[in-house]
Amino acid sequence: MMPLSRSRLEFIATILQNVLNLGLLTLGLILVVFLGKETVHLADALFAPEQASKYELVEGLVIYFLYFEFIALIVKYFKSGLHFPLRYFVYIGITAIVRLIIVDHKTPMDVLLYSAAILLLVITLWLCNSNRLRRE
C-alpha cells in the first residue's frame, strides 16, 4: 500500500469534518424538535391535578435542561471553531446525575455515590476553569 500524500490526507480530513458538521447540525435540529415536544409535555404536567404529575414536572424540567445543554454544546462547537469545550460535557454530566438522583433515589447508598460523582465533576469543573487550564 502506497502512503497517501499530504494533500489527499487533508482532503480526507476535510470530508470527514464536513460529515461530522452535517451530523451535528442534524442532531441539533432533532434536539430542537425534542425540546419543543418536552415543552408541550411540561405544560401538560403543569396543569394536571394529580400529585404524581408534579414528579413528572420536575423530571421533565431536568430533561428539558439536558436537551438545552446539548443544543448549547452544539452551538458552542460551531462558534468556537469546531471545538468542544470540556466544561460543557461536565455540565451535562452534572445535570444527568441530578436527574438520576431525582428519578431513582431508592437506596441512600446510591444517592451518596451519585452525590460523590457530582462532587468529583464539580472539582473537575473548578480545575477546568482555573487559570492554569483555561483556554478561552
Swiss-Prot record:
Q: Does the keyword Transmembrane apply?
A: yes
Q: Which GO terms describe its biological process?
A: cellular response to phosphate starvation
Q: Which residues lie on this side of the membrane: Periplasmic?
A: 36-54, 104-107
Q: What induces it?
A: Expression is under the control of the two-component regulatory system PhoQ/PhoP.
InterPro entries named among the record's database cross-references: P_starv_induced_PsiE (IPR009315), P_starv_induced_PsiE-like (IPR020948)
Entry GO terms, CC:
plasma membrane
Q: What Pfam families would the database entry show? A: PsiE
Residues assigned to the Cytoplasmic compartment are 1-14, 76-82, 129-136
Subcellular location field: Cell inner membrane
The UniProt entry lists membrane topology as: Multi-pass membrane protein
Report the transmembrane regions from the record.
15-35, 55-75, 83-103, 108-128
Keyword list, A-Z: Cell inner membrane, Cell membrane, Membrane, Transmembrane, Transmembrane helix
Family the entry assigns: Belongs to the PsiE family.
Q: What is this protein called?
A: Protein PsiE
